A protein has these predicted regions:
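N-terminal Rossmann-like dinucleotide-binding module
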Residues: 1-46
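Beta-loop-alpha module in the N-terminal Rossmann-like domain of NAD(P)-dependent dehydrogenases
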Residues: 16, 46, 50-109
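A short helix->loop->beta-strand "cap" motif at the edges of active sites that frequently abuts
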Residues: 25-27, 85-89, 113-115
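Short loop/edge segments at beta-strand edges and connector loops
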Residues: 53, 92, 119-121, 177-179
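A contiguous active-site-proximal alpha/beta segment in oxidoreductase catalytic domains
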Residues: 64-67, 72, 96-157, 161
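C-terminal helix-rich "cap/oligomerization" subdomain common to oxidoreductases
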Residues: 64-69, 271-315
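Rossmann-like dinucleotide-binding domain that binds NAD(P)(H)
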Residues: 144-220, 285
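NAD(P)-dinucleotide binding in Rossmann-like oxidoreductases
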Residues: 205-268, 279-283
Length: 315
């Protein structure tokens, strides 16, 4: 039986694993985790998964691997993986890496070893966003705003930036972090940091976007999209979308907008990748370009705030 694996089964990694076990009748599933308490709990929950502590215990051949570790150790584990196993496909969690050199190193190794890779900015896999993208295709101009209180803009903005590229059908042309506040704070994950303020830019027919995180605020996270003929307000957490246009007299109409959880998604994505070689996630090369547009100015931002040089301590 062929094998698939996940490296890192902490909070998010567990969600990946919950979906991967849908494939347990077709593949041997391996999970790499060093935390013995996590292994103990998950072994009881997933008795058919092979839990191991090191990458070197993985099979020599793997159809697909999810690397769901923190960003600061992801390159190291990638190197251990490719030095030990022949891997056909990899899904990386975001934020990919903290150092610019890691992006190029991994890209070169993927090309050298002919490994197909994607990055898990998962909104591209939501049916609701697929439908919305089709709806927005008829418009010439988009203006997008994402705003909320204390929603973790550092680690999560890459999701919204990827979504903007997806909805606009274009790469982000410029990205401005000049409106970020100079109050870097420790995140919930030890050794990583967060910040507040606004990230803005342009992406093709998206003439302007603003991504804002407000400190000391309980404002729910919302995404608003304005076109030349309509307005949309998306509440992902409560699974609805409001839309208004001239035809409705600019009155809001409510529609279902279903959020897809990671525990419902990973198995399906892996199956699509193995069977057809494609999925809706951004490929590594495209996501690398976007990550660097985001990471490089943040390295300077963190340096200006007294942090280690040439490092972006987000995950």
């Amino acid at each position: 039986m062929e094998s698939i694996a996940i490296i890192g089964v902490g909070a998010l990694g567990k969600r990946h694993l919950q979906s991967m076990v849908e494939l347990q009748d077709q593949y041997q599933i391996y999970a790499v985790e060093i935390n013995e308490e996590i292994i103990k709990v998950l072994t009881a929950e997933f008795p058919n998964v092979n839990f191991i502590k090191t990458v070197e215990e993985l099979p020599n051949e793997l159809e697909a691997v999810v690397i769901a570790t923190n960003s600061n150790i992801r390159r190291l584990l990638f190197e251990q993986l490719i030095n030990h196993s022949t891997v056909k496909n990899i899904i990386f969690e975001k934020v990919l890496f903290q150092k610019e050199e890691d992006y190029h190193f991994v890209r070169n190794k993927l090309n050298e070893l002919n490994i197909h890779a994607w990055v898990n900015c998962a909104r591209r896999e939501w049916d609701s966003y697929k439908s919305l993208k089709n709806e927005l295709n008829e418009f010439n101009d988009l203006y997008i705003s994402a705003i909320g209180g204390q929603w973790g803009i550092g680690c999560n903005a890459i999701h919204i930036l990827d979504l903007i590229e997806y909805l606009s059908g274009s790469e982000i042309e410029n990205l401005d972090i000049g409106k970020l506040e100079n109050n870097v704070v420790e995140s919930k994950r030890k050794g990583f940091y967060e910040f507040f303020g606004t990230i803005s830019g342009v992406s093709g027919k998206c003439k302007n976007f603003n991504i804002t995180c407000i400190d000391e605020s309980v404002l729910p996270f919302r995404i608003e999209i304005t076109t030349e003929k309509s307005r949309y307000m998306i509440d992902e957490g409560n699974n609805y979308l409001l839309v208004s246009d001239e035809e409705s007299g600019w009155q809001w109409k409510r529609r279902e907008f279903k959020q897809v959880y990671q525990s419902q998604m990973t198995g399906r994505v892996i199956k699509s990748i193995i069977d057809s070689g494609i999925c809706n996630l951004s490929d590594y090369e495209s996501s690398m370009k976007l990550h660097l547009k985001y990471i490089l100015p943040l390295i300077e931002f963190f340096k200006a705030n007294g942090m280690e040089e040439n490092l972006c301590p987000i995950t």
